[in-house]
Amino acid sequence: MSHSSKAILLRYGEDMEGIERLANLSEVWVSAGSPLQTPAEIAKGIKTWIRDIPEFKKFFFSLPPEVDRKYVRDTVSNCRLTFAERFIATMVWGYGNVGYGPYRVSKMLASENLDTKLSISWGLAREGAALDAYNYLKDNRIEQLGPAFATKWLYFCSDEPVEIPIYDSVVARWIGEHAKEHFAGVPISSEYWSANTYSRYLNFLSKASQLTGLKAGELEYLIFLDAQSN
């Protein structure tokens, strides 16, 4: 680790827990060529998606057998698609072949004023207003959409270089193991909406970004990799 990186860690003091681990993970990842996440295989479950959401059958058939983060980001940025289609692409990536996913998403799609909620949250995310976008969906709920999958939607809505990071159960578990001191006084769980928790998470990743030079989405991915390997 460079002298400047060590100086940043010293400045953070007790908040360095977790940040130093991310710094070490980033060095390994970058030296390995920054490999991308393995695409999510969705072909096996596509019939269930079509069964539970038949009105989007044509869209489901347009999806490739595997989807990665770049594919979903490009899809969510495609203004020729409806907001519902863009949202579905995110949920398919998030749930993959999990059996209950299509049913839950069918309930989300039936939510009142869905198009308005998706378009407003998309716009806030494109502006890089992470906490505003999070709070909007917290205050204007989409049925069955909790904060974990809401942040997946916001992540793909956000435009590089500003990335709105995912905060799901995998991230929350890693935080509890490696960075809980930074989250003192706020709930760590991703199951419940908490602007304080998400704000603390954004602050944590901002500090890690200053140290590593990586974007928030890249740091979240490293957290995901580290959590999955343990």
Language model features with spans:
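Short, solvent-exposed loop/turn segments at secondary-structure junctions
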Residues: 95-98, 156, 224
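C-terminal accessory module of base-excision DNA glycosylases/AP lyases that mediates lesion recognition
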Residues: 1-58, 148, 158-230
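Intrinsic-disorder-associated interaction segments
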Residues: 15, 65, 110-114, 212
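Generic detector of solvent-exposed, compositionally biased contiguous segments
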Residues: 45-82
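Short, hydrophobic/aromatic alpha-helical segments in well-folded domains
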Residues: 136, 150-153, 204
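Alpha-helical context
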Residues: 66-67, 129, 147, 151, ...
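Helix-hairpin-helix/helix-loop-helix acidic hairpins
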Residues: 68-145
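Active-site beta-strand/loop microenvironment that shapes enzyme catalytic pockets
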Residues: 142-158
